[in-house]
Amino acid sequence: MKVLPAKKVEGVLSVPPDKSITHRALILSALAETESTLYNLLRCLDTERTHDILEKLGTRFEGDWEKMKVFPKPFAEPIEPLFCGNSGTTTRLMSGVLASYEMFTVLYGDSSLSRRPMRRVIEPLEMMGARFMARQNNYLPMAIKGNHLSGISYKTPVASAQVKSAVLLAGLRASGRTIVIEPAKSRDHTERMLKNLGVPVEVEGTRVVLEPATFRGFTMKVPGDISSAAFFVVLGAIHPNARITVTDVGLNPTRTGLLEVMKLMGANLEWEITEENLEPIGTVRVETSPNLKGVVVPEHLVPLMIDELPLVALLGVFAEGETVVRNAEELRKKESDRIRVLVENFKRLGVEIEEFKDGFKIVGKQSIKGGSVDPEGDHRMAMLFSIAGLVSEEGVDVKDHECVAVSFPNFYELLERVVIS
């Protein structure tokens, strides 16, 4: 698909529901003691995998993704292996859940997911008493023999919300308390939701302490996904004739790293929280920002914006001076090696960028000429290059653009709504 330069970008929009929160709402409602009602769930390939696995384990769902009733039942051992598709969140969070049930399960995924490391969840869950068998002890497919678990104190080697969540979910049914200590703070949806559901959870800095507990069903409305909004917010800042407002979007402080970095760069940007419903929800406004300054992304913000970091490179193209991202080696372990895919494709578009093992550096005030790019089936990279096309000189041809359906099925539809060509 060829994305051509836009004359003007303007509009008020709401983005699809939050993917991270949808996964957790589905899982926690299946673990609750009584029924739950969930509103505004994101239906995409990743969240369908979580839903289908829970259904195969015995959970009953009624209604559609706009309003879903969830009737939990004790999990029963499934006969078939459980398919996680392309979803790392499904795999890692469900590993934590399944580790705490005395039954045998097998998780498998597509070719991309089968290359992503799972040792990081296997290790703490084995310390708690579960048994795992995986390809090279690190990759899917992965067999889990659940057990009655014991709580542990665990220092995660990387700041990862998925690893932290896997251990906390396992800890719900363990004997004794579970403690997770991270090297830096990662997104906190799991502990925030558990605390709101009455589970004894204490958070001090990067340390989370959880006591085993049961909880009742709940009602929740999922806010818009800040990671999806990010593409439009960045477009609003770098396009020479733009004004964009995103409403009903989640503004959890562990997810607003990109907004903080854009402020540091001098973007014409503001956001406000308008309501709290288990999670803060609000509005983001952005307009053309001709005086962007390059920035070294502060290390503590890196885990809070891991999915948005490649967009910083796009901001850096139009900023004055150098923009540097380091300590982000985690980007190489996503749906693609995002550092390599970013650098290779930016060079194809005529942008000079330097690659590091753990990040990249870009010198500003360049232009994006245009050309053809291959996001390698990675939904976030496909969306990034589409935004690049709108601010390019000649347009950008995005190969395999349909992969955006992994997280944002109506991305191009919303883009057409704000673009005036």
Curated annotation (Swiss-Prot):
Its EC number is 2.5.1.19. Pathway: Metabolic intermediate biosynthesis; chorismate biosynthesis; chorismate from D-erythrose 4-phosphate and phosphoenolpyruvate: step 6/7. It is an enzyme of class 2 (transferase). The active site is at D307. GO terms for molecular function: 3-phosphoshikimate 1-carboxyvinyltransferase activity. Phosphoenolpyruvate binds at K19, G88, R116, Q162, R338, R380. It catalyses: 3-phosphoshikimate + phosphoenolpyruvate = 5-O-(1-carboxyvinyl)-3-phosphoshikimate + phosphate. 3-phosphoshikimate binds at K19, S20, R24, S160, Q162, D307, K334. PROSITE patterns: EPSP_SYNTHASE_1, EPSP_SYNTHASE_2. It is found in: Cytoplasm. One of its GO terms (cellular component) is cytoplasm. Catalyzes the transfer of the enolpyruvyl moiety of phosphoenolpyruvate (PEP) to the 5-hydroxyl of shikimate-3-phosphate (S3P) to produce enolpyruvyl shikimate-3-phosphate and inorganic phosphate. This is 3-phosphoshikimate 1-carboxyvinyltransferase. It comes from Thermotoga petrophila (strain ATCC BAA-488 / DSM 13995 / JCM 10881 / RKU-1).
